[in-house]
Amino acid sequence: MQYNTEDSVKYHYGAFPPKEIDYSLFISELLSATDALARYDQMLKNMHNNEILLAPMRNREALLSSRIEGTISTMDEIMQYEADDDGTTSVQAKSDVIEIVLYQRALKNAQQVLDSGYQLTVNFIKQLHQQLLYAGRGASKSPGEFKTIQNYLADKTRRKVEYVPISPEHLQEGLDKLMHFISDSSLPSLVKTAIIHLEFEALHPFQDGNGQIGRMLITLHLWMEKMLSQPYFYISDYFDQNKELYIKAMRNVSKTGDWNEWIRFFLEAVNAQAISNLEISEEIHNLYEEMKSEFV
């Protein structure tokens, strides 16, 4: 049975980067998100051993980003796999657990590579994708290779194509425009990050794993723009809780050309997630201090 392509949304050819942005429609959200992210980052700066203490948040980000992609697992399974793993990936391990652990490792490796002076380029993204899909179900989905046939985003239950990304024939041109935007745009960092995430998702350059790479780019780009002192910002929780709105706002860019609606949604997501991350970080820090005092 074939999928119905009637009324499917098509990629916005010729509409990237956006020609006009109306800041009056989201200036309040931009200020709130900037403030919330700054307060969260200050907490990171004041937290000793933050890489270790924020491990539970990092695990949850990998879990939720993979869940949005369709991967299902539990936190206990992830922790058990991490504890047992010796650096190699066992083919006996549960596939979805492997995918989530690989997400964590890919993000950590990306930080190390960028920290050494490497730039965010097409080759960097391909290497990130190769690490993400190294094993598990993704191993058969051409890790590190861009699509060569048209891909689709579909509602499998209704057998309906919801979105048609850019064609393979136009992909290189689309990626070149995205890389140029990343390196040359002078837009406010949060607005720029919103546009980068949307465009990568719209291009959907890989056979699989596009959403996870796209969400990694949010954290990595905010870090590169110096809005984060370290790449420890986890936004998938908000996207998971508001999945329908998340997808609708992204689709409307291609459907109606409304970048402002998407940017406003993204800023609301950053604001809400930064506040939540700050609260969780403070709880983790307080628990650490409490336990430390008990053992001194």
For every predicted segment, state its role.
Residues 1-296:
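FIC/Doc superfamily catalytic core
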